[in-house]
Amino acid sequence: MKVVIMAGGKGTRISSVASDIPKPMIKIEGIPVLEREIKCLKDQGFDDIIMTVSHLGNIIMDYFGDGSENSPATGKPFGVHIEYYFEKEPLGNAGALFKIKDKLTSDFLLLNADAMFDVDFNRFVAFHRKRDGLVTLFTHPNSHPYDSGLIVADKNGAVEKWLAKEDARPQYYRNRVNAGLHVINPKVLEISGIDADSVGKIGEDGKPVKVDLDRQLLKPLAGTGKMFCYDSPEYVKDMGTPERYYSVCSDYKEGRVSGKNLRNKQKALFLDRDGTINKYVGFLRNIDDFELIDGVAPAIQKINESGYLAIVVTNQPVIARGEVSFDELEEIHNKMETLLGKEGAYLDAI
């Protein structure tokens, strides 16, 4: 399976860390984050890579070459095959896909080059193939869902709604965010209605035609039954700001990055709900009665930072008693996730 890595961002938000190199070349413990991505892929058999580059892209191309040489950082072979598409003009974060579409003849992985991750990609791809959809999104909870795009899906993982940052959202929602890793069938490019030849050319508005991955290619598939989400607690973190970069550095040093890969056994804390997370009110039937216990969010935040999974296991007899429906219970849990997210905490599963 081919891997397309989007490495064309300017990284203006993280320029204080390194302004003279592309964001994917910023180092984590002496090795560029992009090299760590490539090693994670190569170790799992994904060694056929296309990189889309633009801003300072020559630095990336000079460093990795065609993937057949040794790493300047480690002295070890990259062990992959790399091709490049250089954007002379910005095409948006998905415009380059239309320029390389002849090379994309079957499902491919599409990844961002500026995220730190350690993921079981074979498990991810197997999920995609089992669902037989056009797209599978890698989704996870994060510590700031209030300013992130949210994915709403049914119980089978079919994406029903894609709520971008600017979209109106319900009062309470599940903390499920697109992590920027995707498996995509190239048919998505065909059905988008976008003319590949027009991308990069001057449009009717006098500006070059660009393509936005989320808004123009993926979001329109919500509700069609052709796009699914793959929920995973594995480590994927954007390094777009200095704060997040230093957080990633700390996580790597402490072993939290590799430790979250689902090829490894996981450490977890299982939490009761009533009286542990929310104030005990007996049989909780009304969503308005759900209130977090003071100090719970900071405590769960410490679990999130520890490398342990935070999983809620709760017995709800109000279901058996017919006093609360499954949909109403889900809304109560959405409130729990929303309130925790507002304080920077999240649950890996309920």
Model-found features: residue ranges?
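Conserved N-terminal catalytic core of the sugar/cofactor nucleotidyltransferase
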Residues: 2-5, 27, 31-116, 121-123, ...
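Active-site neighborhood of HAD-like aspartate-dependent phosphohydrolases
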Residues: 265-311
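Catalytic-core segments of class I nucleotidyltransferases/pyrophosphorylases
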Residues: 108-109, 116, 122-129, 142-143, ...
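A short, N-terminal amphipathic alpha-helix
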Residues: 31-48, 296-307, 335-342
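Substrate-recognition element of Asp-dependent hydrolases with the DxDx(T/V) motif
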Residues: 52, 296, 300-336, 346-350
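A short, conserved acidic/glycine-rich loop-to-beta-strand motif
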Residues: 131-141
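N-terminal nucleotide-binding beta1-loop-alpha1 segment
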Residues: 1-19, 263-274
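Short acidic/polar active-site loop segments enriched in Thr and Asp
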Residues: 47, 106, 134, 309, ...
